[in-house]
């Protein structure tokens, strides 16, 4: 494999499960409190150990569902990654920002375990379940940990712009990278009215469709997808022919 191609795949994503404490109407994975679909925990541990010992991989990312709902298990995975000298990144809805002491503990743990990026998903859809005050608490505490890059990801539609979210975060959002991205009709978002989608991407302009990630995603449904775009999950583009396939075969 050419060196340039090797560099594309220095990270891998593990989607641990569909369980979430929110039931957002735009969720690309249709996650909710009642969903039980998840990767087998022992197999996840084996996968993460395999990833951590693979010299090609530099970064292992964890997402869901909501990964902080089973914090002891998440912490055990972070320990595996950190013990191998690799780094972790996390995606969360930030529900744990409710209690200041919990926020302090989690940041101490993340800092010790080599977490370099924490992405918080919060927008008009998430805020129906997770108070924006909780996100503010996380952003304020994050200033004590400059080695952990915080970003806020805001899904938007024509009438749900996320502007009120940014306003309500106040000074806590200052200096924090914010990404606004348009909804696409996958998962639960298929049920949203068509006129809510901006449709800013077009197959007639392929230069707009460049993927910035190139991260294989080990999904809770057992498939391995070639990237993390929500659009990929409604296609036949999968990379595995067996469950819990090792990274080199992928």
Where are the regions that the model predicts?
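Accessory C-terminal segments flanking Radical SAM cores
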Residues: 182-250
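Solvent-exposed, well-ordered amphipathic alpha-helical segments
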Residues: 5-10, 49-55, 136, 140-143, ...
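Short loop/turn segments at strand-loop or loop-helix junctions that form parts
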Residues: 16, 121-123, 228-229
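Conserved alpha-helical substructure of the radical SAM core
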Residues: 1-93, 97-105, 112, 117
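Short, well-ordered beta-to-alpha junction loops that form the rim of enzyme active sites
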Residues: 65, 155, 229-230
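Short coil/turn linker and secondary-structure boundary residues
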Residues: 39, 98, 130, 242-245
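Conserved AdoMet/S-adenosylmethionine-binding subsite of the radical SAM
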Residues: 69-213
């Amino acid at each position: 494999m050419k060196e340039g191609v090797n560099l594309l795949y220095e990270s891998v994503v593990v989607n641990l499960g569909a369980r979430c404490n929110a039931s957002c109407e735009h969720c690309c994975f249709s996650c909710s409190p009642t969903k039980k679909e998840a990767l087998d925990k022992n197999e996840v541990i084996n996968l993460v150990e395999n990833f951590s010992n693979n010299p090609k991989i530099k970064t292992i990312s964890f997402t869901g569902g909501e990964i902080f709902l089973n914090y002891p298990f998440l912490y055990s995975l972070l320990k595996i990654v950190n013990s191998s000298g690799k780094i972790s990144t996390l995606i969360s809805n930030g529900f744990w920002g409710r209690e200041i002491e919990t926020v302090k503990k989690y940041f101490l743990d993340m800092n010790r375990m080599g977490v370099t990026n924490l992405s918080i998903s919060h927008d008009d859809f998430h805020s129906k379940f997770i108070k924006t005050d909780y996100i503010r608490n996380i952003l304020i505490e994050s200033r004590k940990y400059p080695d952990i890059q915080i970003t806020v990801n805001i899904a938007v539609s024509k009438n749900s712009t996320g502007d009120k979210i940014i306003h309500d975060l106040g000074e806590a959002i200052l200096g924090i990278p914010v990404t606004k991205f348009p909804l696409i009709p996958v998962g639960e978002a298929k049920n949203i009215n068509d006129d809510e989608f901006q449709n800013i991407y077009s197959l007639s302009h392929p230069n707009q469709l460049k993927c910035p990630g190139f991260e294989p995603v080990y999904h809770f449904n057992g498939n391995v997808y070639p990237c993390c775009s929500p659009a990929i999950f409604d296609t036949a583009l999968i990379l595995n022919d067996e469950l819990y396939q090792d990274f080199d075969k992928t």
